Amino acid sequence: MASLASPPLPCRAAATASRSGRPAPRLLGPPPPPASPLLSSASARFPRAPCNAARWSRRDAVRVCSQAGAAGPAPLSKTLSDLKDSCWRFLRPHTIRGTALGSIALVARALIENPQLINWWLVFKAFYGLVALICGNGYIVGINQIYDIRIDKVNKPYLPIAAGDLSVQTAWLLVVLFAAAGFSIVVTNFGPFITSLYCLGLFLGTIYSVPPFRLKRYPVAAFLIIATVRGFLLNFGVYYATRAALGLTFQWSSPVAFITCFVTLFALVIAITKDLPDVEGDRKYQISTLATKLGVRNIAFLGSGLLIANYVAAIAVAFLMPQAFRRTVMVPVHAALAVGIIFQTWVLEQAKYTKDAISQYYRFIWNLFYAEYIFFPLI
């Protein structure tokens, strides 16, 4: 059995010898080979640390590594944060802002016209309606991204599916949840007519993107769908639902008729100019748009011209119907917005229609869209 015992370690043997007063035993076996001069000099410069010191160094290293791991972000929290960011980008925030501002402005207008009927119950119902509209918006823009992955890798690589931040399976789950949640809210809180309008909007958003229809391939059909959903259905539907919640039958007011016509034409401009930043990818995948057919410059001038005509018409309406509109708001606001689009078009021309300049021009059009709804309750 003695032959199976391990020989004592040098440090342990030395320690035992020092306590007993006897010299340390010499280990059996051949003597170690002589060290080379290079190793000898290295050993002289860097003497070995004692065994206890080495053991404590290993413990310190483990402790430091453990502290460094604890200081880093937890994997679950980082995953949830990334998922939240991807879902937010998946919703296309600029479209949500337009939907939210439009619905809030129209509800505010209906309440301004009937202040005696305001009660707190309407606030909750309006909130449900806003959530349903955002869900519908999320479904439409989400289904479009699912079927535009290859094109978005060229035109919009920052979108979550194209960037690989969101899987197609997760995207499908989100759009189904959006559609189901929005439909459930509308069915349980609003009447059959509003439910029918909501389903019509979802249907138009579906045939806009989904094969075999995919009407976005045809410029005229795409323009009509966008103008109908964002222009007519949103404004008419929200105003109708608000009056119904107030216990009133539907009746057009001059300001609501104005904003419906104005925004419908504005949505047509958005539909025309939305393809300007996407010309590169559309040409690569042979998607026919007005921008690929007529050129970026011509479409930019067409969109700006339609907006200027829209603003001129708004100013004319203020003069022709002073009893229905506040001229002191309508005239200066729309004149300033018209000057803004003229200036932005000039900036685009000076920039020689670079991709960054085109994107800035398109964002400015959306800002004008938001501005119209912000000022609408005041007109």
Swiss-Prot record:
The chain crosses the membrane at residues 121-141, 174-194, 195-215, 220-240, 252-272, 299-319, 328-348, 361-378. It catalyses: phytyl diphosphate + homogentisate + H(+) = 2-methyl-6-phytyl-1,4-benzene-1,4-diol + CO2 + diphosphate. Its main location: plastid. One of its GO terms (cellular component) is chloroplast thylakoid membrane. CDD domains: PT_UbiA_HPT1 (cd13960). It holds the Pfam family UbiA. The keyword ATP-binding does not apply. Pathway: Cofactor biosynthesis; tocopherol biosynthesis. GO terms for biological process: vitamin E biosynthetic process. It is an enzyme of class 2 (transferase). InterPro entries: AtHST-like (IPR044502), UbiA_prenyltransferase (IPR000537), UbiA_sf (IPR044878). GO terms for molecular function: homogentisate phytyltransferase activity. Its EC number is 2.5.1.115. Residues 1-65 form a transit peptide. Residues 1-39 are annotated as: Disordered. It is found in: Plastid, Chloroplast thylakoid membrane. Keywords: Chloroplast, Membrane, Plastid, Thylakoid, Transferase, Transit peptide, Transmembrane, Transmembrane helix. It is a multi-pass membrane protein. NCBIfam families: PRK12887.1. Involved in the synthesis of tocopherol (vitamin E). Catalyzes the condensation of homogentisate and phytyl diphosphate to form dimethylphytylhydrquinone. Belongs to the UbiA prenyltransferase family. This is Probable homogentisate phytyltransferase 2, chloroplastic. It comes from Oryza sativa subsp. japonica (Rice). The gene is HPT2.
